[in-house]
């Protein structure tokens, strides 16, 4: 090989050395998959991710490693996923709160656009919301709670399990629709919110069912209403908000898997199939049920449409209520 030819070959090698080889959907996955959860360990999102990861790694034949990247209400982990290589080896399992839908209108400086920088893979599940009170307050109905709030304007305290969550915006909407001025106390998660509810520091809480399920069963908390379209199988005697005259109050925190923009559509379809199969397995169904959660089966397109609708819905609630991250 003459010198000119050799230099040309070396030049081509140097120019292409930094370009990663394309990922083949036919051989995917060929190494472990990272599943980012943008919240701390122990919460509903983390529990669902670990349950799903255990079943997925059996069907995919590669480890699925859950990595918690908490911070900024879930934005840090979500942004890290959006900026990851679009090779199918970094996924996001997140909730409907600030990072993906509900709180987006409250956080104008988010560094990504959900449906532009991320690709929906699948839905995962949802959990009911329930309006609960401390039974020591002797409020045995929604009407009794509203009457108490109106009798003591600005004094009855409601816990907000997180600013920018569905519970936060629904509490703002509750105040608007009932005309009852309430005192909203923000918390950093359901755990501390429920502790203060049990201790009588706050009077009421619109809370994720998994966080209060056992406390309701034990009688330490009283459920006044379910914020779902149907009554809870756990507490069939508790009416829905719609039954009580508030049809807007039908909402469930939901969970979805996303991938970075540009991920091979064949990989998205493959992951969707494996996730949906896992969600129908006995192990996952039972583990979710223990958390008060229900698996949700959806295609990537259905997931995209649902998230788009949710973004619009909660943006409307923010506009109407004037809710803020404060």
Swiss-Prot record:
It is found in: Periplasm. Residues 1-25 form the signal peptide. InterPro entries: BUG, Bug_dom1. GO terms for cellular component: periplasmic space. Keywords: Periplasm, Signal. Belongs to the UPF0065 (bug) family. This is Protein BugT. It comes from Bordetella pertussis (strain Tohama I / ATCC BAA-589 / NCTC 13251).
């Amino acid at each position: 090989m003459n010198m000119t030819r050799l230099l040309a070959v070396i030049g081509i090698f140097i120019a292409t050395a930094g370009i990663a080889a394309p990922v083949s959907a036919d051989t995917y996955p060929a190494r472990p998959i990272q599943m980012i959860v943008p919240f701390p360990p122990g919460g509903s999102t983390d529990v669902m991710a670990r349950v799903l990861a255990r079943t997925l790694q059996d069907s995919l034949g590669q480890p699925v490693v859950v990595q918690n990247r908490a911070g900024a209400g879930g934005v840090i982990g979500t942004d890290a996923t959006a900026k990851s290589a679009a090779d199918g080896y970094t996924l996001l399992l997140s909730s409907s709160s600030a990072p993906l839908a509900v709180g987006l209108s409250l956080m104008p400086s988010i560094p990504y656009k959900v449906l532009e920088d991320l690709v929906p893979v699948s839905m995962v599940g949802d959990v009911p919301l329930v309006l609960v009170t401390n039974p020591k307050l002797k409020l045995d109905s929604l009407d009794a709670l509203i009457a108490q709030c109106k009798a003591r304007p600005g004094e009855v305290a409601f816990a907000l399990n997180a600013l920018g969550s569905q519970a936060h915006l629904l509490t703002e909407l509750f105040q608007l629709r009932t005309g009852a001025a309430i005192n909203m106390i923000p918390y950093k998660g359901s755990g501390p919110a429920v502790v203060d509810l049990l201790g009588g520091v706050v009077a009421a809480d619109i809370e994720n069912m998994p966080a209060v399920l056992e406390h309701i069963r034990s009688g330490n908390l009283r459920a006044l209403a379910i914020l779902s379209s149907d009554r809870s199988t756990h507490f069939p005697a508790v009416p829905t908000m719609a039954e009580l005259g508030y049809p807007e109050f039908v909402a469930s925190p939901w969970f979805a898997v996303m991938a970075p923009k540009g991920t091979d559509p064949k990989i998205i379809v493959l992951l969707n199939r494996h996730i949906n199969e896992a969600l129908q397995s006995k192990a996952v169904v039972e583990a979710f049920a223990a958390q008060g959660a229900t698996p949700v089966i959806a295609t990537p397109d259905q997931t995209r449409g649902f998230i788009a609708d949710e973004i619009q819905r909660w943006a409307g609630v923010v506009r109407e209520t004037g809710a803020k991250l404060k």
